[in-house]
Design a protein with these regions (language model features):
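Short, polar/flexible loop-turn hinges at active-site or ligand-entry regions and domain interfaces
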Residues: 1, 17-21, 40-49, 89-90
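Transmembrane helix-loop-helix
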Residues: 1-17
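Extended, well-ordered alpha-helical segments in internal regulatory regions
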Residues: 34-42, 159, 176
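Short His/Asp/Glu-rich catalytic/ion-coordination signatures at enzyme active sites or charged loops
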Residues: 78-91
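Cytochrome P450 catalytic-core helices
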Residues: 163-181, 186-188
C-alpha cells in the first residue's frame, strides 16, 4: 500500500516539472490517503473532493492549534468561555465538528454495508466488536462504541498525518540543503536497488547510509 502511494505521489510531483514548488502542502496527500485506506478501505485519487476536503480541514485545524492564544488557553481554558469568538474557539469547534461529521458519515456507510464475515478495514472490525459487545460498561458498547470509534478515527488522523508529513518535509529540506548527502543516498539506492525498484522495509538492512540519514 505504501509503495502504491509512493508511485502516485511521484507521478504528482512529476507534473510540476523541474521548477520550484511548495511541497509542504502536498506531502499530506499520500499520508492521509494511506490512513484512509487502512481505516475506511477507500483509495482516493489526489483530486478527489472527499480527500481534498479532509486535507483542507486538517490543515486548518493544525494552523489554528499552533496560534499563541491557543497555547495560552491550554494554561487557562476557562478564558475561552468568556471570549470564544475573539479567541477563535467557535471556529475551532466548527472545524472539529466538520472533521467528525466526515468520520461519522463513513461509519454510517460502513454500518449499512457491513458483512461480519468479510471485514474490509479498521471501521468494519470496530463495528463488529460493537455488535458483539453486551457489557454496558465496555467502551465498545452501543452508541458509546460508535462515539469512541469516531474519536479514534480523529485521533489517528491528527496523530498520524501532520507528524509524518512534517518529518518527511524536513527530510527533503535536509537533502536540498545538503546535495552531497543527497548524491550519496541516491548512489546507494541505485547500487542496491537499481534504477527502478521501489524500496521496501526488507531492503532496509542493505541501505545503511540511507537509513542513517532518514
Amino acid at each position: 500500500m505504501i509503495q502504491e502511494e509512493l508511485i502516485k505521489f511521484r507521478a504528482l510531483l512529476e507534473t510540476y516539472g523541474e521548477g520550484p514548488f511548495d511541497i509542504a502542502g502536498k506531502m499530506n496527500l499520500p499520508i492521509i490517503n494511506a490512513l484512509w485506506r487502512v481505516t475506511a478501505g477507500e483509495d482516493f485519487e489526489y483530486n478527489n473532493p472527499v480527500l481534498v476536503d479532509l486535507l483542507t480541514r486538517m490543515t486548518e485545524w493544525f494552523k489554528r492549534v499552533g496560534r499563541p492564544e491557543v497555547i495560552f488557553l491550554f494554561a487557562f481554558p476557562w478564558i475561552a468561555k468568556l471570549w470564544p469568538s475573539f479567541l477563535g474557539r467557535d471556529e475551532d469547534i466548527k472545524i472539529n465538528k466538520d472533521i467528525m461529521n466526515m468520520m461519522r458519515k463513513s461509519i454510517k456507510n460502513h454500518k449499512e454495508t457491513l458483512d461480519t464475515n468479510e471485514p474490509r478495514d479498521y471501521i468494519d472490525k470496530y463495528l463488529i466488536e460493537i455488535q458483539n459487545t453486551k457489557d454496558p460498561n465496555s467502551s465498545f458498547y452501543g452508541e458509546k462504541g460508535i462515539n469512541n470509534l469516531a474519536a479514534n478515527l480523529l485521533d489517528l488522523f491528527i496523530a498520524g498525518s501532520e507528524t509524518t508529513s512534517t518529518t518527511l518535509t524536513w527530510a527533503i529540506l535536509y537533502m536540498v540543503r545538503n546535495p552531497d548527502v543527497q548524491d550519496k543516498v541516491q548512489k546507494e539506492l541505485d547500487t542496491v536497488l537499481g534504477k527502478y525498484k521501489i524500496p521496501s522495509l526488507s531492503d532496509k538492512p542493505s541501505l545503511p547510509y540511507t537509513d542513517v540519514k532518514y
